[in-house]
Amino acid sequence: MKQNRRNFLGQIGLAGIGLSFSAALAGCYQRNRGPALNLYTWDTYVGKHTLADFEKASNSHVNISLFANNDELFAKLRDGNPGYDVIVPSNDFVERLHQAGSLLELDHARIPNMANIDARFLNPLFDPGRKVSVPYTWIVTGIGYRKSKVDGVPDSWKWVLDSDKYKGRIGLLAEASELFEIGAKYLGLPANTADVATLARIEAMLIKQKPNIAAFHDDNGQDLLLAGDVDLVIEYNGDIAQVMREDSDLAFVVPREGGILASDGLCIPKGAPNPDLAHQFINFLLDGHNSAHVSETIRYPTPNRAALALMPAEYRNNPVIFPPAAILAQCEYSHFQGQIIQSAYEQAMTRVRAS
């Protein structure tokens, strides 16, 4: 079954709720349902029974809202927290939100299951000491493709950024900073290169490529690929791994120039109605069994050692979920470089899409 938003919400028992939870966000307690936890996250990003299990364990109620990309998440919090308790930004947006003063410092004493996290993820440059974020997944961006529709393996970003061979059959990410970082990798530059000349060069390339693009997608590239709307799409490894279980004609590759690495984190925004329950939820997600259930559902690599030990070999040895070290060596993390650079990315992307 296609893992679109409505199917996924149905699987976790929330199909009738929809995307807007403004009524739930108006308060933090629901009559006869216990305190409410308001979660703002990506689509297909919890286990099928994760939320029900937490509700039972904590005598609480979870409201889930979905965002399509980090830009949407940041915009929602720019003028203050509208009522969320836990959010799930990517590493560069953890940095951006922290600099904006939007994140609550975590009380590690209330998150003892952080002991399950691999030490490699505990002191990143974007959040030294993990003061405001807890690692949830890590991610590699590459190209998802339909094997029967392309000639060989699309092992270069050229296939999607600088070629008309698959005109009208290509999907690109809509998130400005990441698309321009990928453009820099294709040009042989560090991903975070953002000088005026480089941004202009990437913008011109994308404008030239735009007639060949079927869609700029908001984290639903796997759905486009599965439905046959595109044959090549820039997407995250976990999303493509999800649909590869449903269609053996689909595959994923990290281009030889290297991809973009990311680490999504669990954060509590300032002004959270229920920070105590938020800490409890984060600790619940970091339990080995609970984290393993999430990983089995969403197919992203886990930074949780206890969860990894519980996962089957099919997951642990899957090169889409865990690309080989030689491939990862060519990949880079993106970094928030300040509002001036971020605005330059966004303005350039606006011009590309308007061209």
Language-model-derived ranges and their functions:
Residues N7-G27:
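N-terminal export signals
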Residues Y29-R96:
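Early extracytoplasmic/lumenal segment of secretory-pathway proteins
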Residues G83, V88-D229:
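Extracytoplasmic ligand-binding site segments that recognize negatively charged/polar headgroups
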Residues F93-H98, L226, L232-D249:
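A ligand-binding cleft/hinge motif common to bilobed small-molecule-binding domains
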Residues I139, L199-K208, A214, M244-K270:
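Periplasmic-binding protein-like
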Residues G144-K149, K185-Y186, A262-P275, I282, ...:
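A bilobed periplasmic-binding-protein/Venus flytrap-type ligand-binding module shared by bacterial periplasmic
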Residues P269-A329:
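Mature extracytoplasmic/periplasmic domains
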Residues A325-S355:
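Conserved C-terminal helix/tail region of periplasmic/extracytoplasmic solute-binding proteins
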